[in-house]
UniProtKB/Swiss-Prot annotation:
Expressed by the venom gland. Disulfide bonds: none annotated. Residues 1-22 form the signal peptide. Belongs to the neurotoxin 19 (CSTX) family. 07 (U7-Lctx) subfamily. Contains 4 disulfide bonds. This is U7-lycotoxin-Ls1c. Residues 23-26 form a propeptide. Its main location: secreted. It comes from Lycosa singoriensis. InterPro entries: Spider_toxin_CSTX_knottin (IPR019553). GO terms for cellular component: extracellular region.
Length: 76
């Protein structure tokens, strides 16, 4: 009887861990999406990079989005 209960609890734990892992994978921010400056939430191999925006020489704030780690964009 104890073996049946132990086996049932072990299976429940394994199923719960698999479900939590699947939910965490779907919760990341995809490539090109807006992120926050805390650098958290982007999917693997992506980082949250922020750039200052200017209009007619006046700074208009900052925009952050998830891009590949190490990639830098520049205006030509």
């Amino acid at each position: 009887m104890k073996l049946i209960i132990f086996t049932g609890l072990a299976l429940l734990l394994i199923v719960s861990l698999i479900d939590v892992e699947a939910q965490n994978e779907g919760a990341c921010i995809p490539h090109g999406s807006v992120c926050t400056t805390n650098h958290a939430g982007c999917c693997s191999k992506l980082s949250c990079d922020c750039y200052r925006r200017f209009e007619k020489g006046v700074e208009k704030g900052q925009k952050c989005w998830c891009i590949e780690t190490g990639v830098t964009f520049s205006k030509e």
